């Protein structure tokens, strides 16, 4: 398992723990704020371009133990910024100041630094930010949850997007990841020695439009 997938699994674990503690993922901003509060972090919404954001969309101040984020966009977009900074705290220990200049909630995994060739094309900072973005998306919209809603409960991607207050493109990308990628750490889930295969791109795309 690579570091990116490990980060996503940790985000899913935190999502489930937050839900178990009473968090409501259909209210993404409140959900992200609750996780920050549970970690003793102060969170402040600032106007776009505020000097304290240091030219970014969100920052983490390790000395103050606080997250500052740009107060614009939907609740989901603001929650994503907070969750992105939480990724730095959870995965890196919160020992470094961070300025997040840009985020891509609907980033395709093909754009992430997976494999030697792609990693060589990325600098350390870019790889780090990709991982935090995927952490944030997994925290707000875990793949197993979306797969369950879509495949077993029959919800369309539009219905899931409405339930979580998330952009449709983000939900569809996360669903594609859930349907196309093999589940991590599931040895021999189908019979002795067998491994369940992920859906093909065509099959997954067909499911998304149903």
Positions of PLM-derived features:
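Active-site hotspot residues in diverse enzymes, especially metal/ion-binding acidic/histidine motifs
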Residues: 1-210
């Amino acid at each position: 398992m690579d570091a990116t997938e490990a980060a996503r699994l940790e985000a899913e674990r935190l999502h489930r723990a937050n839900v178990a503690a009473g968090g409501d993922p259909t209210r993404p901003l409140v959900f992200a704020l609750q996780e920050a509060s549970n970690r003793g972090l102060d969170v402040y919404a600032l106007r776009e371009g505020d000097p304290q954001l240091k030219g970014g969309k969100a920052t983490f101040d390790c000395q103050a133990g606080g997250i500052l984020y740009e107060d614009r966009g939907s609740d989901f977009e603001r929650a994503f910024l907070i969750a992105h900074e939480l990724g730095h705290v959870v995965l890196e220990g919160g020992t470094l100041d961070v300025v997040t200049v840009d985020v891509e909630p609907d980033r395709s995994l093909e754009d992430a630094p997976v494999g030697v060739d792609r990693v060589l094309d990325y600098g350390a900072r870019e790889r780090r930010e990709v991982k935090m973005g995927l952490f944030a998306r997994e925290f707000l919209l875990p793949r197993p949850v979306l797969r369950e809603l879509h495949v077993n409960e029959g919800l369309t991607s539009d219905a899931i997007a409405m339930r979580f207050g998330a952009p449709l493109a983000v939900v569809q990308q996360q669903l594609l990841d859930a349907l196309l990628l093999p589940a991590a750490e599931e040895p021999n889930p189908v019979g002795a020695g067998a491994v369940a295969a992920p859906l093909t791109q065509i099959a997954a795309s067909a499911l998304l439009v149903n």
